[in-house]
């Protein structure tokens, strides 16, 4: 039997350290499921594992793409599943570490298939978003797929404020001439592994404190310079994310630098709250306090393995 040990939790909670400890114990490799860490141009602002951490265990899907590539969750599902299957040929265990709930779900449950979209359609949607803002995307989705718009409004309203997701919805509607929702739940996905889900959590005050500290460290490590280098490409889909978006507003003259830094902290805290909301929907996840001794978590996994045999 093959086991995918999946580690989830909010940003800055300690998932990387735990994943390395588990990879070393089970003598296996790590597949990253953090959609922000795929891109090689984004290092500091995405908290990519350090070189020492990368050397401690073999990682996959870390800085393996460029921000200039169009890389969807469907692309990731296909590539990551192929890599996981390859790793299972040599080992009964693979570690999946996830901060991006949608991408974790794609691996564990499968994702719906969507048609190829003309790059010109994608570029036009991106340009209109840059000119008209998130309201343009919201209005487009409301007109092109009112059923799905209503579903998001009721079940996951924060998605309406997510430029990456909204641009994807709209480009599929326009490019396919069909509602986005018409492509959902059309296939059943089978997985040839057993997932073991581990969640890390902490009191909100601790999470927020760790986030604030991480942002300060990022700024000291050169996040401002990294964002400045990326600023000419600020309209790219991959850069519509916390940590960069706020500094782009500083370069635009809309924010002072101290205000931009506080916005990064605030928006990252909000992001962590959304992460927890998403991950806690899965009742099969075993949650541990972030300070739990790693041997206790390893013991839980080993006992879980015994019961599944």
Curated annotation (Swiss-Prot):
Reactions that this protein is recorded to catalyse: adenosine(37) in tRNA + dimethylallyl diphosphate = N(6)-dimethylallyladenosine(37) in tRNA + diphosphate
- Top-rank taxon: Bacteria
Q: Name one Pfam family in it.
A: IPPT
The answer to whether UniProt assigns keyword Cell cycle to this entry is no
Complex formation: Monomer.
Q: Which family does it belong to?
A: Belongs to the IPP transferase family.
Which protein, by its recorded name, is this? tRNA dimethylallyltransferase
Species name for this entry?
Flavobacterium johnsoniae (strain ATCC 17061 / DSM 2064 / JCM 8514 / BCRC 14874 / CCUG 350202 / NBRC 14942 / NCIMB 11054 / UW101) (Cytophaga johnsonae)
